[in-house]
């Protein structure tokens, strides 16, 4: 049990931080949050856990309400607090779901969180491999590369207000 508690704490901190790291494009973290919440809600509903399913539907509704004001111009934004809070809600909903429904595979839940976890893992590995501090930001996240590609290839650097939300939609 102590090893499981330590793993849960490590995984929770990692996933919550991952949602903050993908908050580099306007609306991306919100969109990923909505996608993950819908997926978890469906899994919870199929497993018979209607409380978690309904809670996650409410999270989706709140995020969609936020996105109305955030996308495409970014009148308001999540910031660290919002990204951490949403990641926290999702990861603990997943933990509750795994503990309440034995038929729910932890690997299925991990697949739901694939995008933020993979992007964070690749960022840490890339920084370590290049000899850079792993806790320092860089501009090599997949969403940043996609936005720069759209800017350079289609819009030009002076059209970031178009490339930023479009990159979110593409991803």
Each predicted region: which residue ranges?
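Alpha-helical transmembrane segments
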Residues: 30-171
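Short, contiguous clusters of charged residues that form electrostatic/catalytic patches at enzyme active sites
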Residues: 4, 13, 144
């Amino acid at each position: 049990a102590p090893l499981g508690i330590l793993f849960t704490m490590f995984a929770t901190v990692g996933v919550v931080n991952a949602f903050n790291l993908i908050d580099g494009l306007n609306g991306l973290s919100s969109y990923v949050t909505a996608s993950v919440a819908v997926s978890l809600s469906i899994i919870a509903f199929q497993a018979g856990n209607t409380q978690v399913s309904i809670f996650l539907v409410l999270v989706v509704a709140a995020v969609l309400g936020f996105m109305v004001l955030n996308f495409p111009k970014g009148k308001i934004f999540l910031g660290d607090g919002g990204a951490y809070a949403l990641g926290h809600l999702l990861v603990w909903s997943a933990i509750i779901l795994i503990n309440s429904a034995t038929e729910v595979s932890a690997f299925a839940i991990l697949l739901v969180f694939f995008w933020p976890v993979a992007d964070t893992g690749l960022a840490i590995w890339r920084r370590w491999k290049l000899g850079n501090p792993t806790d320092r930001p860089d501009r090599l996240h997949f969403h940043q590369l996609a936005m720069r590609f759209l800017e350079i290839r289609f819009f030009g650097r002076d059209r970031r207000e178009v490339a930023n939300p479009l990159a979110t939609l593409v991803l």
